[in-house]
């Protein structure tokens, strides 16, 4: 057995235990460490001992955010309505520890699926707010270590802007991982694709020097967004009048509607063009019957796809099989999320949402990937909040601070060019997003935008008629009528864009990050301090740091 590894993991666990309340909790940690030691012993022949030892230590640290809360706040875990005893809180924590240790044992049983950290199995990057959090920037950075990058939901309504080697790239359908010259990029079955826009995006990338040939694949099961869908999108928005949703008018909703009505056309249909033509004629007739003002021309649209079908079919494959074969072959797969959790058709602020599921479930339904193949789930959180279009926004600002955030943060939509609404970071919303997705790590982006503010605030609770709300209300009127409780913290004036370590940040900025981490109970691993791909601080987890140092 690698006793040095086990002893380091044990010492790290003991140091963490010393910070926790109650002898039972410390005893449980000792027992958990023993289980971890046995895991190391069992995996000796198949896996590096250090890897399992580190996993063990990290599992024990997984509840650090809960342990650091005060008694009353911690008692709220497990959905308790009233403060409960420390012993009950400890039991809730231990449930988390057991869950994480079971994952370690799964790693031992399936050593080909697990190593240190990310890059094993399927990792996922998801927006945790209302979009525009900076997902593309992290994907651009992480993708250099992955073999396959895949999108699983949404369409050209999504937009990523990335500054890469001094050039600004704008992505809508193509995964931003295409900037990794060694990666294969996939548009999964859950994406709806406007093929003319897709080809235009590829041509723009080619003009900027990106060689995508042979590296971009489209699912034969992906549904197509047609020009008539975009026209219908605009008509629907006009019909809503003052109840407009704020759609991007990219045809996303109508395309998903066709999918659910089972009269849509899929990319793979282009292989059998006579059938495709018949489906197109029927679809145009269906929409003209329901939208007399529609100007769609079936023959003209069929001609467009006849001209491009060969080029598209060269990129079209069964991506479900491709992804799962890549997984079995040990390829590193990264899912690049589009839109965000609060725009999810089921979990977002309905009806002011998108028409797909840009939360964790879309990885399975939009990529054909089994949930037991998922590894890291990374939530992207802007250091403040933004939203494009209509819909409730509890922490929205209409003052000089809101103007500062919009101006300094260059908050204009990549897809629409519309100015984004800005506000303070919303913890109740983030806790809800964290609950839905089960984030393993967070990336806090655009911390530099808060520079120059004398005071910064964090929305920590919603109140309605004198009562604190539990969770995120599904009723929009209740959400709109709620009052946000804020915590105020000191701001900072120092330029942080050149900071490379957490310790280099101003003390006030460090306190802000740590407070957000404490409130969410999830480790903030990455901190964005500027627009470039390298303007990111990577934080070592406290227990991982203790383990590596061996102190």
Curated annotation (Swiss-Prot):
InterPro entries referenced in this protein's UniProt entry, alphabetically: Adenylosuccin_syn_GTP-bd, Adenylosuccin_syn_Lys_AS, Adenylosuccinate_synth_dom1, Adenylosuccinate_synth_dom2, Adenylosuccinate_synth_dom3, Adenylosuccinate_synthetase, P-loop_NTPase
Predominant localisation class: cytoplasm
Domain of life: Eukaryota
Amino acids binding substrate: 414-420
Keyword set includes Calcium: no
Keyword terms, alphabetized: Cytoplasm, GTP-binding, Ligase, Magnesium, Metal-binding, Nucleotide-binding, Purine biosynthesis
Transmembrane segments: none
Record: residues binding Mg(2+): 132, 159
Subcellular location per the Swiss-Prot or TrEMBL entry: Cytoplasm
Top enzyme class: ligase
Pathway: Purine metabolism; AMP biosynthesis via de novo pathway; AMP from IMP: step 1/2
Cofactor annotation remark: Binds 1 Mg(2+) ion per subunit.
Molecular function via GO: adenylosuccinate synthase activity; GTP binding; magnesium ion binding
Annotated EC: 6.3.4.4
Keyword Transferase among record annotations: no
Binding-site residues for GTP, renumbered to this chain: 131-137, 159-161, 420, 446-448, 528-530
One Pfam family matching this protein: Adenylsucc_synt
Protein's GO biological process: 'de novo' AMP biosynthetic process; IMP metabolic process
SUPFAM superfamilies: P-loop containing nucleoside triphosphate hydrolases (SSF52540)
Protein family (similarity comment): Belongs to the adenylosuccinate synthetase family.
Protein name: Adenylosuccinate synthetase
